[in-house]
Every structure is written in C-alpha cells, then in structure tokens.
C-alpha cells in the first residue's frame, strides 16, 4: 500500500515536471526560435552574401589550387554562369505562392549545401562540371526569392529594405576579407571549408521561424504559362532593358579592373582596398536609402544610376591616378546600389505572383545574363582596346537614360 502511494506520488511529480518541461520548451521556442521578420530577412541576406563573398572572389583560386588549368577553370566558371542564369529564370518563378517562399528558400539552401559538400568528394573535371552546374543552379534562385520575400513583407509590415539589405553587403566584405586572410595562412583548402561553413549557417538561419509569415495571392491558373510571361515582358521591357544595360556595364569592372590597376603599378593589396571601398560606399547608401531616396520614383533612380555609370566608366578609361580611382569606387554606390534600389522599388509595385516572376527575370537577365554576355565582349575589347573597354561600358550605360520605363512605379515610403 505504501508502495502504491509512492508510485502515485512519483506519477504526479512526473506529470508536474512534464508540464513544466513542455511550458519551458514552448517558451524557448517562442523567444529564441522565432525571429522578428526583418531580422530573419537580414540574417538570410547576411549568410547568403557571406558565402557569396567567399565564392565570387576566390573560387577560381580554389580551382587553380586543385591543379586545373586556366582554360578548364574558364569552362567551369562559364558553365556556372549559365546555370545561375537558368536557376534564376526557371526555378524562382515556380514559387508562385508568396506563402511558400520560406519553404522554397529552405529547400534551395539544403540543396546548395549538398552540392557544396560534393566538392569534397572528387576533383575530376567531369565531376566538378556536374557539381558546379548543380551548385549554381540552386544557389542563384536564393537571391530573387529572398528579394521577393522582402517585397511581400513590405506590404505586410513596416520595413526599411535598404537597412535590411545592407547586411548582405557587410557580410560580403567580411566573407572576402576573412577568407583572404585564411588563404594566406592555409592556402586554397580554406576556401571550400569557409564556403561549407557559410552555407551551413545559411541553412540553420533559414530554419528559424519568422514572426510574420508571408501572405499574398497565389498565381491564378488562367494567368499561368506563356501568356503571363508575355504580358509581364510587354509591360516591363523598358525596365528590363534599362537595368540590363546598367548592370551589364559592370562586366569590364568585375572581370578586368584588378588586372588593369595592377598593370598601372598598384599592388594587389591596394586593389583589394579599392574593391572594399566600393562595397563600403554600397553599404552607406543601402543604410541611408530610406532618408535619401524615400520620395524618389524608380524612374528617377534609374536616371541617377545611368548618369553615375557614364561618369564612372568614363573616368575609369581616362585615369588611373589614385584620387580618380577613389572617386570611381565611391561611384559604385550609384552604378550598382541605386540601380538595385530602383529595381526593387519598381518590382515592389507589382501585384501578386508578378512580383516573384519579375524578380526572377530581373535576377536572371540583368544580374546574370547581361553580365555574362558583356563579360565575353569585355574580354575581347580589353585585349584589343585595353582601357578603351571602359569607354565602351560608358556608352553601354548611356541608352538607359532614354529607356527608363515611362510609367514610374509608385513611391514606396518604406523602401
């Protein structure tokens, strides 16, 4: 009888502790696992661009470190660019329901990590080709889908996009700087290790639950397929042409500025500082975008970006003096950042699934395809015209002044 009483007492004690445990776990999940939506978005940008800050500057160094020739490296990087273009254009638009954006981001982050882990498995050219294509195919849609999530949340909550997106720029600087230091200490092996850690962090961050889930109208069945795309392109072709010219004009800078400046007598460290200056200028404008451009329309921002492009690329072909290069790099906030802010403002004015579709086309065509195509031409022009390639880039940016969309997207006080 005494034993029975003891069992009952223990049972009651167990029930009490179970209730306390469940309540504690629920509290922890509520307080820790749930992240404010703007912080969730900032973390997503940070972890993505931290990883991209490793991949973009240093992946060719890793490929060279495992013994590949420059020609083979070029082929692999070219295949990656094509995969990035296709990933943004074909995968991102498949997410037609804004409420499924977070799930899509988590799946893509997982697939990207799996392909990054596959780089550890082998170094044959055939294997690397498959892995490069798979990695870029799933890595590239993360940006347009994250931007689409930002646009969706701007309709639901008060959010300063520039102050959120700036964490991506900060992360890019940190990722490239830390990896550069580690490469000097541990050679190329540090690159893949850092990339893997960055992608693990990205996946873990995206597994957290945002405080506000995205909501919106999913794509209607009758609007699906080619008619929806045809209508979108017909309505937005001026916008797409404009941003493609402005972003594509960066091709010579991305591909050949380091070579050009080193040939002019600057050390590799100085070239690195100049690149960092451009990103710092980008960070400043993203941070202050709400105050600086709150009343600017997308059309006005595109004009400012085009003017900055003509001035920047013209100066780059004209001088290699250090004061001129400092000004050239500060203008990065005008040629890239202002253009991107204009694009986000224009896209945010769309409705429903058009936000996701146009975001995907912008990322694929302007941020991917145009730069890839212009890089091919820039290589030919740099070989034959040398610094004259930057004058050509200034001419590329010039038509954007007249190609700006006639109907301005609405001014968004939160963008």
Report each predicted region and the residues it spans.
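Helix-loop boundary and gating motifs at the non-cytosolic
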Residues: 34-81, 236-242, 247-272
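Juxtamembrane intracellular "pre-TM" segments in multi-pass secondary transporters
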Residues: 35, 210-243
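Hydrophobic core of transmembrane alpha-helices in multi-pass small-molecule transporters
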Residues: 46, 126-142, 244, 324-338
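Helix-to-loop junctions at the C-terminal end of transmembrane segments
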Residues: 87-100, 183, 285-297, 382
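Structural signature of the two symmetry-related core transmembrane helices
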Residues: 103-116, 300-314
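Intracellular juxtamembrane helix-capping segments at the cytosolic ends
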Residues: 140-155, 338-351
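Symmetry-related core transmembrane helices of the 12-TM Major Facilitator Superfamily/SLC fold
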Residues: 191-207, 389-405
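A late C-terminal transmembrane helix in Major Facilitator Superfamily
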Residues: 356-382
